[in-house]
């Protein structure tokens, strides 16, 4: 009976296991068959090699007795010396049986043995086919580096490695070799050696300035090659007057005097070509890069225009056909001569001056439209025309009159008078003068005078109060750091504070801030000023950095107000209605001889001061009301319901009619102010049908109209209706009474 056999013959075995065993065996055979001079020391613990049967085999190839070549290799390997420098093993202390270093490998060059682990190889597969020990590798690297360091060129040698630097140095060498004066060569040194030395030194200086070797490096090298070719530059280099450092870091004009003279000639020629020239035909020619352009002569235009003007004040009886040519005289006797520069009409003269001032100020700041600056411009125009040039008759071609230089007057630098107070410490009267500011220019003509006037206006706005207090103190170093940071983004105004007399409190405050290194904080700065400080300056000490940028300032000892102002601030132009504060000045005067009424009266606004009406006021009231001015209306009792007033329309009324004054936009029409004690006999008689339409004018409205007429007499005399538009446009300035703003409709709020 045969033993039972399982249907699964490969039960418990992997189907591919035998194939993997074969592949592993072939790989091991290939590894063992590689010709390698290696010495494997087998240790029973760590370096055992197992064969396919699982038995331990010695790495010294004792099982390969049949191979004669392997025996010969083992014999040669035993002959090499052991020299493992990392662990210190050598032929004296090395014992193959007790060595724990593991596998040893032989150097293919010196045939010495080292531990594979000491040489950095973790296993046998990482060992290269051609192995060299650490000592042999160092000697090999040194021999390879030596030829790379030196790059010889016939005639001279350089130790540079970069191709760009070598090419630049060679170019310098060529220029030096050709241009070195033989007399400047020292004994024992020829031109080749000197040129080589100079070329290397010059290239090194260029490389220090431009280490990136970019376009600037090459451009600078080319420029230096042109310079060192010049005889005077080469002479200065050979004598030691010009060093290579100065040669690289100086401009060509500073090195070569001839080039400096040539550059100056080029600049002068450029300036000459840019200036307008006048040819013989009185044509102005502008020379530009596009060529010559003929510009129409403005003087010729003005002369032709003067010829065509028909004079209105010429005495035609003096003109004769055979009259002599005109002669230029000074206007001192007759007023019948033709006025060539001014017209006798005041209105036309003012209009012409206004047009000229507008043309002059097209490119100026908006502040040039201020009244004071306009007065200065008009004053300059009048100063130019003080000596009037007149002609007896009008020739065919008038002769040109030489123009006078415009004159100007420097405005006073004083911007303030008042009192400086340090609470509970010091108080003194002082004046303030503008010393300097950002973009400050000392007045030298009409333009700079206008700018100076603008600076003075800003200074007056900064110190607008009569009394300024020192609100606080700040450490000077901290303030200096802050001011140094904002000096480029803000405008600075430096104003000197001087006492009106020898005041001890001034010296007391100055000594306190100076000794303790403090900065005072001034009160009352306007909205356009960010900071206001009271600082101390001493002539013997250097200026702070933020003040060194201010021009026109000579350092002195004393107290100074420093304002940090918004960049480019320009003072606003004044309104056509000046002195607005005067509308609030009149104080109420209690009425006298009041009439007693049984009914309660309306609450009245403050009474107007007794002030006689002027004819101008009567004129405008007549225009506004449509009739003659009415005396102050009679008192009215309180009605049962709230009064609502309708805004009247402007229209012509028949003589004797008296209409209510139209209310201004944005202001209510208040009930009329009662006046007590007025005699009925003194009041004019009116028709009964017009008694109900008395003038309704409050005290504030009356004061406003009086100031309006006072400040604008021309409009009140000739165009009273224009004052209504002025009052409408400046409704915010209506007396400052704090009344509620009216609606845009015809109905106004009820006065309770």
UniProtKB/Swiss-Prot annotation:
Bias type Acidic residues, positions: 45-54, 62-80, 341-355, 362-375, 742-752
Pfam family, one: TFIIS_M
Biased composition (Basic and acidic residues): 290-303, 313-325, 376-391
TFIIS central domain: residues covered: 160-283
A GO cellular component annotation in the UniProt record: nucleus
Location of region: Disordered: 1-99, 289-408, 625-693, 710-752
PROSITE patterns xref list: TFIIS_CENTRAL, ZF_PHD_1, ZF_PHD_2
An example Gene Ontology biological process: transcription elongation by RNA polymerase I
Keyword DNA repair in annotation: no
GO molecular function: RNA polymerase II complex recruiting activity; RNA polymerase II transcription regulatory region sequence-specific DNA binding; zinc ion binding
Record's keyword annotation contains Transcription regulation: yes
Cellular localisation: Nucleus
Compositional bias of kind Low complexity: 639-654
Ranges of Polar residues composition bias in the record: 9-19, 329-338, 675-693
Principal location listed in the UniProt entry: nucleus
Superkingdom classification of source: Eukaryota
Keyword entries, A-Z: Metal-binding, Nucleus, Repressor, Transcription, Transcription regulation, Zinc, Zinc-finger
Endpoints of the signal sequence: none
Biological function: Negative regulator of transcription elongation.
Family as reported in the entry's similarity comment: Belongs to the BYE1 family.
Protein name: Transcription factor BYE1
Highest classification ranks of the organism: Eukaryota, Fungi, Dikarya, Ascomycota, Saccharomycotina
């Amino acid at each position: 009976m045969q033993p039972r056999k399982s249907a699964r013959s490969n039960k418990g075995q992997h189907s591919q296991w035998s194939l993997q065993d074969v592949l592993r065996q072939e790989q091991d055979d290939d590894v063992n068959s590689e010709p390698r001079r290696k010495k494997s020391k087998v240790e029973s613990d760590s370096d055992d090699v197992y064969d396919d049967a699982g038995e331990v085999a010695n790495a010294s190839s004792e099982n390969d007795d049949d191979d004669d070549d392997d025996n010969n290799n083992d014999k040669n390997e035993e002959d090499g010396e052991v020299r493992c420098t990392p662990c210190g093993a050598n032929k004296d202390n090395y014992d193959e049986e007790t060595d724990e270093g593991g596998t040893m490998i032989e150097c293919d060059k010196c045939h010495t043995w080292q531990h594979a682990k000491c040489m950095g190889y973790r296993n046998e597969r990482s060992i290269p086919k051609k192995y060299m020990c650490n000592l042999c590798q160092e000697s090999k690297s040194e021999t390879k580096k030596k030829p790379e360091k030196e790059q010889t060129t016939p005639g001279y040698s350089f130790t540079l490695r970069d191709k760009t630097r070598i090419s630049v140095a060679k170019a310098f060498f060529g220029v030096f070799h050709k241009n070195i004066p033989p007399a400047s060569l020292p004994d024992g040194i020829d031109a080749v050696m000197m040129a080589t030395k100079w070329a290397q030194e010059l290239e090194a200086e260029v490389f220090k300035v431009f280490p990136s070797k970019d376009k600037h490096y090459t451009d600078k090298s080319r420029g230096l090659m042109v310079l060192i070719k010049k005889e005077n530059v080469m002479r200065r280099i050979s004598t030691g007057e010009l060093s290579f450092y100065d040669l690289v870091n100086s401009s060509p004009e500073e090195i070569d005097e001839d080039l400096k003279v040539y550059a100056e000639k080029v600049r002068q020629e450029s300036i000459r070509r840019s200036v307008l020239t006048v040819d013989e035909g009185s044509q102005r020619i502008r020379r530009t890069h596009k060529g010559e352009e003929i510009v129409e002569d403005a003087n010729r235009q003005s002369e032709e225009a003067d010829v065509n003007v028909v004079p209105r004040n010429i005495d035609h009886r003096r003109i004769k056909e055979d009259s002599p040519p005109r002669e230029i005289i000074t206007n001192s006797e007759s007023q019948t001569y033709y006025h060539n520069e001014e017209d006798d009409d005041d209105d036309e003269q003012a209009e012409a001056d206004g047009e000229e001032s507008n043309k002059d100020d097209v490119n100026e700041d908006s502040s040039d439209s201020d009244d004071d600056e306009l007065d200065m411009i008009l004053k300059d125009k009048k100063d130019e025309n003080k000596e009037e040039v007149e002609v007896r008759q009008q020739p065919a071609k008038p002769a040109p009159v030489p123009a006078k230089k415009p004159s100007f007057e420097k405005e006073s630098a004083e911007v303030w008078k008042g009192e400086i107070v340090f609470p509970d410490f010091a108080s003194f009267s002082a004046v303030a003068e503008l010393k300097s500011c950002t973009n400050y220019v000392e007045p030298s003509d009409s333009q700079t005078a206008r700018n100076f006037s603008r600076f003075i206006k800003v200074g007056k706005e900064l110190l607008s109060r009569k009394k300024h207090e020192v609100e606080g103190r700040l450490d000077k170093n901290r303030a200096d750091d802050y001011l140094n940071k904002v000096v480029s983004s803000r405008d600075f105004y430096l104003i000197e504070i001087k006492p009106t007399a020898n005041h001890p409190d001034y010296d007391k405050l100055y000594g306190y801030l100076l000794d303790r290194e403090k900065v005072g904080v001034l009160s009352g700065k306007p909205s356009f000023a960010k900071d206001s400080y009271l600082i101390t300056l001493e002539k013997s000490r250097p200026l702070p950095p933020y003040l060194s940028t201010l021009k026109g300032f000579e350092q002195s000892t004393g107290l100074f107000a420093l304002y940090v102002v918004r960049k480019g601030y320009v003072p606003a132009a004044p309104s056509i209605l000046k002195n607005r504060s005067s509308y609030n000045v009149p104080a109420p005067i209690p009425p006298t001889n009041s009439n007693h009424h049984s009914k309660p009266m309306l609450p009245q606004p403050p009474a107007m001061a007794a002030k006689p009406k002027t004819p101008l006021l009567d004129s405008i009231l007549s225009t506004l009301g449509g009739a003659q001015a009415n005396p102050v209306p009679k008192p009215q009792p309180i009605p049962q319901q709230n009064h609502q007033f309708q805004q009247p329309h402007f229209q012509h009324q028949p003589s004797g009619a008296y209409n209510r004054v139209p209310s201004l936009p944005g202001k209510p029409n208040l009930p009329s102010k009662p006046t007590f004690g007025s005699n009925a006999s003194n009041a004019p008689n009116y028709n009964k049908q017009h008694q109900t339409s008395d003038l309704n004018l409050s005290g504030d409205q009356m004061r406003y109209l009086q100031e309006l007429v006072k400040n604008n007499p021309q409009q009140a005399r000739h165009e009273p209706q224009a004052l209504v538009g002025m009052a409408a446009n400046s409704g915010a300035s209506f007396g400052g009474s704090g009344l509620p703003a009216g609606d845009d409709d015809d109905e106004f709020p009820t006065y309770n």
